[in-house]
């Protein structure tokens, strides 16, 4: 699967699982994405897809590397659709 396609799928999943934050931007917790069954089946490497989307300035989140458990409460914020 190519990276652009995975990033597009990630945006769709953020729309499905996320909600508007105080700034009016769509966001979802990393733990919600990571523990979702559909996401687990869609993404072989969720963290890699998140990093690719962040490099493309489609999403943002604090930190560089997200780890299950440790970073479950980190907000993944959608910057563009």
From Swiss-Prot:
Superkingdom, taxonomy of origin: Eukaryota
Gene Ontology terms describing biological process: regulation of actin filament-based process
Post-translational modification N-acetylmethionine, affected residues: 1
InterPro entries: Costars, Costars_dom, Costars_sf
Pfam family, one: Costars
Keywords, comma-separated and alphabetical: Acetylation
Family in the record: Belongs to the costars family.
Protein name per Swiss-Prot or TrEMBL: Costars family protein ABRACL
Record organism: Bos taurus
